[in-house]
Regions:
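Conserved alpha-helical scaffold flanking the Walker A/P-loop in AAA+ ATPase domains
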Residues: 29-32, 85-105
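AAA+/P-loop NTPase substrate/partner-engagement loops
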Residues: 60-88
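P-loop (Walker A) phosphate-binding loop of NTP-binding proteins
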Residues: 45, 79, 147
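Walker A/P-loop
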Residues: 34-71
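Canonical AAA+ ATPase core
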Residues: 86-89, 112-116, 124-200, 204-213, ...
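Pre-Walker A (pre-P-loop) alpha-helix and adjacent loop at the N terminus of AAA/AAA+ ATPase modules
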Residues: 4-48
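C-terminal engagement/docking regions of AAA+ P-loop ATPases
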Residues: 3, 232-313
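Walker B catalytic acidic pair
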Residues: 44, 107-108, 119
Length: 313
């Protein structure tokens, strides 16, 4: 990658940091997923900055932005749009829904009905939406950042594995450090004041550049070996799918790209695997009863497969 592109990426991160203090790793992970062409699920309690992060990124990336506050009465048509009869032309006219945008914040997605969740996740997967038998393309780029409150919060219901698998990554933000929280109280740049660094067109160009990042065959085999081990691990009831393996490859390329390299290393894979695969495996009842976590199991899998040595890059 030429230095100009690396400087652009650093500028995007620096702009978002103006509104989000002390969460550099979170911001980097989100940008990695965006460059990989994926969607983001943020799983955390209210008030830690989920909406601020979404607004900051939409402004820094120069994208059209919409937000939907999910509640049980939000309908699929609120997401996809609907056809309305136009008396003047004696025809039906398409009225766009919230998904007709570049950057959609789906706030508290696990408060919505399963039917509405499915409508959004279908658009995420297909990049198209269907209304009354007609298909419409969503704008490019199309990025969904969904948030959900921890399961057990009032009015929430867990997203099924088939739906969480549509998200490239799942991350948590966590509380700020004491020092960062003091700085937040003193005042930070409003997310809406973030200056655009890119446009939708230039972001699409960077996403295409990421796809050209080189990965040697041994690293493809490494990812497949990790996936296969997850499917036969004694503590895992639902292992990694081929789609999840593809997501890990895409995230690894984007991680290398952000670091200014045009080739993937094993470290790239190991760095992104926790938040790329953490929501895609289900532990057995016995594993949960003994207090094991997905992070521990993924570490066990990583330590069980020999790490390839780069001989060509």
């Amino acid at each position: 990658m030429d230095m100009n592109k690396k400087e652009i990426i650093n500028t995007v991160l620096n702009e978002t940091k103006k509104a989000v203090r002390g969460k550099d790793d979170v911001l980097r992970s989100i940008l990695t997923a965006i460059l990989a062409g994926g969607h983001i699920l943020i799983d955390d309690i209210p008030g830690v900055g989920k909406t601020t992060i979404a607004v900051a990124f939409s402004h820094a990336l120069g994208l059209d932005y919409k937000r939907v506050q999910f509640t049980p009465d939000v309908l699929p048509s609120d997401i996809t749009g609907f056809s309305m009869y136009d008396k003047s032309s004696d025809s039906f006219r398409y009225m766009p829904g919230a998904a007709v945008t570049n950057f959609l914040l789906a706030d508290e997605i696990n408060r919505a009905s399963p039917k509405t969740q499915s409508a959004l996740l279908e658009v995420m997967q297909e990049g198209k939406l269907s209304v009354d038998g007609k298909s419409y393309d969503v704008p490019k780029p199309f990025i969904v950042m969904a948030t959900q409150n921890p399961i057990g919060s009032s009015g929430t219901q867990d997203l099924p594995e088939s739906q969480t698998d549509r998200f490239m990554i799942r991350i948590s933000i966590g509380y700020p450090s004491k020092e960062d929280e003091i700085n937040i109280l003193k005042g930070i740049t409003p997310a809406s004041d973030i200056q655009p660094v890119l446009t939708g067109e230039s972001l699409c160009s960077l996403q295409e550049d990421v796809k050209q990042v080189h990965m040697i065959d041994d690293l493809y085999a490494y990812i497949v070996s990790l996936a296969h081990l997850s499917r036969h691990h004694k503590d895992i009831s639902l292992g990694i799918s081929p789609r999840a393996a593809m997501a890990l490859a895409a995230m690894s390329r984007a991680a290398a790209f952000i670091d200014g390299r045009n080739y993937v290393t094993p470290d790239d894979i190991q760095k992104v695997i926790p938040f790329t695969w953490g929501h895609r495996i289900s532990l057995t009842g016995d594993a949960r009863m003994t207090g094991k976590t997905t992070e521990q199991i993924l570490n066990d899998i990583l330590h069980s497969i020999p790490v390839p040595t780069l001989t060509e890059a």
